[in-house]
Amino acid sequence: MSDLFSFNNKEKKNKIIYTNYSAKDIEVLDGLEPVRKRPGMYIGGTDSNAMHHLVSEVLDNAMDEAVAGFASIIMIKMHQDHSITIFDNGRGIPIDNHPKFPNKSALEVILTTLHSGSKFSNNVYHTAGGLHGVGISVVNALSKHLKIEVYQQGKLYSQSYSKGEKLTDLISTEVSKRLRGTSINFTPDPEIFSETLHFNPKKIYEIARSKAYLYRGVSIEWECEVEVPSDIPKKALINFPNGLKDYLSSKISLDNLVIPEIFSGNIESTMDAIKLEWAICWQNNDTSAFMKSYCNTVPTPQGGTHEQGLKSAILRGLKAYSEMIGNKKSANLTIEDIFETASVVLSVFIVEPSFQGQTKEKLVSNGVSKLVENIIKDHFDHFLSSDKVLATHLLEHVIAISEFRRNKKNERNISRKNATQKLRLPGKLADCTRTSAEGTELFIVEGDSAGGSAKQARNRETQAVLPLWGKVLNVASSTLEKIINNQAIQDLEIALACGSLKNYKKENLRYEKIIIMTDADVDGAHIASLLMTFFFLRMPQLVKEGHLYLAKPPLYRLTQSNKIYYACDEEEKIKLTYKLSKTSKAKIEVGRFKGLGEMMPAQLKETTMHPEKRSLLKVTLEDVQNVDKIVDDLMGKKPEKRFQFIYEQALVKMDQIINKLDI
């Protein structure tokens, strides 16, 4: 443990900058009283995300020491009691008395006073990530227990707090002069965050990894004493020599790239007072595209001026390259076209950043956009000119997206029930007559046979039927080009008229319920899985809003004494057969439907389509990350993941069977 607190110049490649750092550098702006009363104003709420935000705040302070060149090692430890310890081997928080508060140490002022810290002045930190002095005092106010230890000039200074109040005076003991840094151990207050909330090891580990990616010169030592998921180590040294390029490589499938190169760079400009790092790649489909940005190691999920600069640079670069090779199709390119399938990670370090809101989710600093744009544009021009084959391939990729977008826009501009101009709907669609979407339903069926029965069984005013031609495409393992050119997907998107992905507009959705109606057998379940995958990856908002349903057509028809009964699956058939045999000794005849097309329209209406007699399964989307993993495992490109998923589910099913048999 003591090694962590040691400072060794040989371990540190970056130059250490020694400056005078004392109590006079700590500025005081305000008090701490409002924090416990209104925590949401400072950390965005009192839920699990807000609680984990406390870890980010303490870690940001440690990262600031590293970014400023004063620390090379950071440690994060999650203890058995669910408390967290974060340590950095930096200079240590000043412990001498503060000029404005002669009876208080600077350490106590920082921990008990809102808006106190050294980050308001450029003399100590040129770039800072914590909440400008708010961070550690807010963590203290919202912690049941907090203990801070400072190693400085051969002494260990320690002090304990609870709910923002001091429990002990500053205590000092003699230690080795080699030890330096700050250690903070804290436990969130259950009165604020609920007793059932505990830190999630996976979440904290990912926070630590993201910080290590952002500053390649820092090593973060991770240790967890509580039980962790199989994909999270108990102990690890987190260090990424290639920074954001390493991060992006770990998040994408390298065999699914439009061009086999990641466009990345790492630039520091003393003249412009900016440090900039980025990594961008383009994938063959947009199902896993993402954009993450940071300013001074703080996540900016709502983007801001740094993202605007990057986007403008890439747009300008591609248009300039297109003009150079004489391709006129780039004239209509937009930022949305270029970043439709792009995954991006961006990090900037600047002096005195300006953010929107207390929790810093959007960067609004003036001048940053142009700086970022100019730097990245120069490097992107060189990237494109260095390999014209790859550059042309990338250009053709984004132009195809642009043309598809413009075609979809033209289709969306056509009103669904406009009396003077009819929508160019798919030829196989049997639309309903009601002009508004309220109370209407679209049944998606496979093939003309099932479509014919469904069209005869429907309520023409409120129910539409769309038979899909050919094989339904698995969008999880298909390129964007295949998705765009697939006839079944084109028909479906045109019929719904709501657009997909970033172009989704719920007000344009033409039906209130979208009902997947497939055969009740294994083949039907496979088709339903493909369609659900399509909706999850292309129209997740539609699923979240509760528009997607699965029909439950019968697989079996049971007849006894001229009475007809229906069963959806084998288990229901067995139960129904047993029940009928108990009530009557009459013979039971069992028939199995080969598909929806074999059913008479009256039967289909009675069992599957009549709103008062049918059963529907509503498809919901709650744990998005888990669903995303399942879709990737089961429907993605890698067969080994699919095999493992099926194998694990088979084991679960076998256990259920064994339990039922009581073996």
From Swiss-Prot:
Q: Which GO terms describe its molecular function?
A: ATP binding; DNA binding; DNA topoisomerase type II (double strand cut, ATP-hydrolyzing) activity; metal ion binding
Lineage top rank: taxon: Bacteria
Q: What class of enzyme is it?
A: isomerase
Positions that bind Mg(2+) 2: 519, 521
Q: Which residues bind Mg(2+) 1?
A: 446, 519
Q: What InterPro entries does this protein's entry cite?
A: DNA_gyrase_B_C (IPR002288), HATPase_C_sf (IPR036890), Ribosomal_Su5_D2-typ_SF (IPR020568), Ribsml_uS5_D2-typ_fold_subgr (IPR014721), Topo_IIA (IPR001241), Topo_IIA-like_dom_sf (IPR013760), Topo_IIA_B (IPR000565), Topo_IIA_B_C (IPR013759)
Q: Which UniProt keywords apply?
A: ATP-binding, DNA-binding, Isomerase, Magnesium, Metal-binding, Nucleotide-binding, Topoisomerase
Q: Which residues form the Toprim domain?
A: 440-554
Instruction: State the free-text cofactor note.
Output: Binds two Mg(2+) per subunit. The magnesium ions form salt bridges with both the protein and the DNA. Can also accept other divalent metal cations, such as Mn(2+) or Ca(2+).
Protein name, as recorded: DNA topoisomerase 4 subunit B
Q: Which organism is it from?
A: Rickettsia typhi (strain ATCC VR-144 / Wilmington)
